[in-house]
Amino acid sequence: MSAQLEADVRTMSPEMPAMFDGMKLAAVAAVLYVIVRSLNLKCPTAAADITCQDTLLNHYLLKSCPVLTKEYIPPLLWGKSGHLQTALYGKIGRVKSPKPCGLRKFLPMQDGATATFDLFEPQGVHSTGDDITMVICPGIGNHSEKHYIRTFVDYSQKQGYRCAVLNHLGALPNIELTSPRMFTYGCTWEFSAMVGFIKRTFPQTQLIVVGFSLGGNIACKYLGENPANQERVLCCVSVCQGYSALRAQETFLQWDQCRRLYNFLMADNMKKIILSHRGSLFGMNSSRMEFADLSRLYTATSLMQIDDNIMRKFHGHNSLKEYYEKESCVHYIHNISVPLLLVNSSDDPLVHQSLLTIPRTLAEKKQNVIFALTLHGGHLGFFEGAVLFPQPLSWMDKVIVSYANAVCQWEKHKPQCHQQKE
């Protein structure tokens, strides 16, 4: 009997490792499947989807801006994941970011606030020979010292552009507020003050308006608020903005694309900025902020809660809906008449697909608007690279400067451009 059992053990034992190897192989296959799915490795690359009217100017701009119409190729292993593109942008901004040297300017505002911006002179002559200044509005809570801004400024300087970068009110950690007010979603006061300073100081310069994310909302709202704001403006470029805070409100509470998690993380960052200025914001004699409940700020888990308890009160809005309605560029952007490039990414986890009907419809109706939608890029990522390591310069940087160059050439040589088309 024991001999028979021993024989059975000898017969079964060689099969046991084979079974375990099969389980390991299945586990590895499952992990690889999850990686491939989460990194979207099977997703193709493509050129940006362009929406615009068939006009002479648009033909010229698309022909003169090949980076906009050629295939955008992100890093192979992770670049097709909007989450990783967004995370890398949020964590490091850009790789090997340069440190351009500029001068910090301080502008007193009528309400006692002090706007600041950094001014960077060009490092060469522009291809047109003209004096051209890029006026740049960064993303939420950002400023001129952020890596993605530094990279873009350095690249623009080398192309012959002067750059003026707004530091959002309260965003710089080493600059104290001088009034009980900080930046909001759509307040254009500081951006307007910076543009006004540039126009007065450099009376011959022409302007390129650039906005990133929240900065895109502010830039477009500023241009659309008053036709006079578009004087001496050659064009505007907006990247990764959401266009309507009211319509975005519901999407930010959804777990789709982990949007609720991003909402929590951004709210946590906003809390840190607000609390770093608690003495200036809540310690001064401010009738608008006396009803702000700091205990609700500490427990807030979404931007909407912070906006309702704190942000809307800076400008006396009676409700969150009123705040979002009046501070969104969707109600002003149709007033922009200068060439306007709107760039978004399909895999941006912060901007829901439903919001992209706004720029698409605008581009279909207005001759001066081009809407470019990429498959990949995340939120302000748009990294390029071969396999693993991204390049210092992003696709976004190249597109903005290339488009700006094309508009400048068009304005400089309009008769020749018309003849080339004919």
From Swiss-Prot:
It is a single-pass type II membrane protein. Keywords: Cell membrane, Glycoprotein, Hydrolase, Lipid degradation, Lipid metabolism, Membrane, Serine esterase, Signal-anchor, Transmembrane, Transmembrane helix. The keyword Repeat does not apply. Its EC number is 3.1.1.23, 3.1.1.6, 3.1.1.79. GO terms for cellular component: sperm flagellum; sperm plasma membrane. It is found in: Cell membrane. The keyword Plastid does not apply. Residues 1-15 are cytoplasmic. InterPro entries: AB_hydrolase_1, AB_hydrolase_4_sf, AB_hydrolase_fold, ABHD4. Glycans are attached at N142, N285, N335, N344. It catalyses: Hydrolyzes glycerol monoesters of long-chain fatty acids; an acetyl ester + H2O = an aliphatic alcohol + acetate + H(+); a triacylglycerol + H2O = a diacylglycerol + a fatty acid + H(+); 2-(5Z,8Z,11Z,14Z-eicosatetraenoyl)-glycerol + H2O = glycerol + (5Z,8Z,11Z,14Z)-eicosatetraenoate + H(+). Residues 37-422 are extracellular. Pfam families: Abhydrolase_1. GO terms for biological process: acylglycerol catabolic process; medium-chain fatty acid biosynthetic process; medium-chain fatty acid catabolic process; response to progesterone; sperm capacitation; steroid hormone receptor signaling pathway. GO terms for molecular function: acetylesterase activity; diacylglycerol lipase activity; hormone binding; monoacylglycerol lipase activity; nuclear steroid receptor activity; triacylglycerol lipase activity. Residues 134-385 form the AB hydrolase-1 domain. PANTHER family: ABHYDROLASE DOMAIN-CONTAINING PROTEIN (PTHR10794), MONOACYLGLYCEROL LIPASE ABHD2 (PTHR10794:SF79). This is Monoacylglycerol lipase ABHD2.
